[in-house]
């Protein structure tokens, strides 16, 4: 699927993009140009449709990586006197805590193992033990292991207890079903360079309109103030500060391809096929996934590193990279692992080819897996 000699990025973002998406960045756009502003509006409208949020939600785009959007959402939506429950089963959950610490917002950490999904019962127990909790910051797909946390059950318990739910859907948006009509979710955060198969550089937050309109002056940051961004864009149709024009154009093209493929169901099905092909081929080489199948998301798979003394990730990475595939280092704290992504403009055959390249690298380096 990839022309030329570009490497295949088996990472959770940036990821391999289609030629059409790259070609969309060949045109320059004026940041105040009416055509560009219409494109931004269309992109936001399409993002809302993916999660069925057209009626009660708004989509606010923001320059920068997904973490910029996460910090913007927390700073804009959580009052200074609020208290945020953070279920923590990985590095990206821990990042939420670091953001809250920097902003001086109170939080309660729900500590979980790196292979343990959060449960609605555990969240409800935290509500019962800590009445001061006002918000929950929940990572839908913890990319450090590829762990899928439940969403609908968490949303239901938050709604039942009157808690505001902010969801980091960075690595699930577009690949896994999310339906805002079911209720319980106040904000949803993602970015251009993940499962939508755009390029990095634009985050976005989908929020209940009523909550955003009540958040004026709350953000401690000028650049990350989503209320200010929303009001300015409504008034002028323009971004407050220089927009990532080429990123928006690439996302526009990527969304067109997303729709032509069949939307979220088709995108998710392709990624599931990719994941199944990868896991099967890697098991044949002797590798074992870190997660159980029932909690494995079809986005990135974490594998246990070989125990062979000849194993060194840097040398292994370089050998696989030489064959045209870029892997991802492990991000777990307890065991040595590495990760292989299943997403991007690739199919199951590409994952089988990648596994073959991994097998050749093991032979070349004299590494025994079993």
Swiss-Prot record:
Biological process, per Gene Ontology: organic phosphonate catabolic process
Single GO molecular function: 2-aminoethylphosphonate-pyruvate transaminase activity
Keyword Cytoplasm: no
SUPFAM superfamilies: PLP-dependent transferases (SSF53383)
Catalytic reaction equation(s): (2-aminoethyl)phosphonate + pyruvate = phosphonoacetaldehyde + L-alanine
Keywords, in A-Z order: Aminotransferase, Pyridoxal phosphate, Pyruvate, Transferase
Any one Pfam family match given in the protein's UniProt record, by short name: Aminotran_5
UniProt key word Mitochondrion: no
Modified residues (N6-(pyridoxal phosphate)lysine): 194
Parts of the chain that traverse the membrane: none
EC number of this enzyme: 2.6.1.37
Top enzyme category: transferase
Cofactor: pyridoxal 5'-phosphate
Oligomer and partners: Homodimer.
Family matches, as HAMAP family: PhnW_aminotrans_5 (MF_01376)
Family listed: Belongs to the class-V pyridoxal-phosphate-dependent aminotransferase family. PhnW subfamily.
Function: Involved in phosphonate degradation.
Name by which UniProt lists this protein: 2-aminoethylphosphonate--pyruvate transaminase 2
């Amino acid at each position: 699927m990839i022309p030329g000699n570009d490497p295949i990025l088996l990472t959770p973002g940036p990821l391999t993009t289609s030629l059409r998406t790259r070609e969309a960045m060949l045109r320059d756009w004026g940041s105040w140009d009416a055509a560009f502003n219409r494109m931004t509006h269309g992109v936001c409208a399409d993002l809302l449709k993916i999660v069925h949020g057209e009626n009660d939600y708004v989509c606010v785009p923001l320059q920068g990586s997904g973490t910029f959007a996460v910090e913007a959402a927390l700073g804009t939506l959580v009052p200074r006197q609020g208290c945020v429950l953070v279920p923590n089963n990985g590095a990206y959950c821990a990042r939420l805590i670091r953001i809250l610490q920097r902003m001086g917002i109170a939080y309660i950490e729900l500590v979980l193992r790196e292979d343990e999904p959060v449960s609605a019962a555990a969240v409800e127990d935290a509500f019962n033990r800590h009445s001061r909790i006002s918000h929950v910051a929940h990572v839908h797909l913890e990319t450090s292991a590829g762990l899928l946390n439940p969403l609908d059950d968490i949303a239901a318990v938050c709604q039942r207890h009157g808690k505001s739910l902010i969801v980091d859907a960075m690595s699930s948006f577009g690949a896994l079903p999310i339906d805002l009509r079911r209720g319980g979710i106040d904000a949803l955060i993602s970015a251009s360079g993940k499962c939508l198969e755009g390029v990095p550089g634009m985050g976005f937050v989908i929020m209940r309109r009523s909550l955003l309109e009540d958040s004026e002056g709350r953000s401690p940051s000028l650049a990350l103030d989503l209320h200010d961004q929303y009001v300015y864009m409504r008034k002028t149709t323009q971004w407050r500060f220089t927009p990532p024009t080429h990123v928006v154009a690439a996302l526009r093209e990527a969304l067109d391809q997303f729709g032509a493929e069949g939307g979220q169901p088709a995108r998710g099905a392709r990624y599931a096929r990719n994941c199944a092909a990868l896991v099967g081929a890697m098991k044949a080489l002797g590798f074992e996934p870190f997660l159980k199948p029932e909690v494995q998301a079809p986005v990135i798979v974490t594998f246990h590193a070989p125990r062979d003394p000849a194993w060194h990730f840097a040398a292994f990475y370089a050998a696989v990279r030489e064959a045209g595939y870029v892997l991802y280092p492990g991000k777990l704290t307890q065991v040595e692992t590495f990760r292989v992504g299943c997403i991007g403009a690739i199919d199951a055959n590409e994952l089988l080819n990648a596994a073959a390249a991994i097998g050749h690298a093991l032979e070349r380096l004299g590494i025994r897996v079993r």
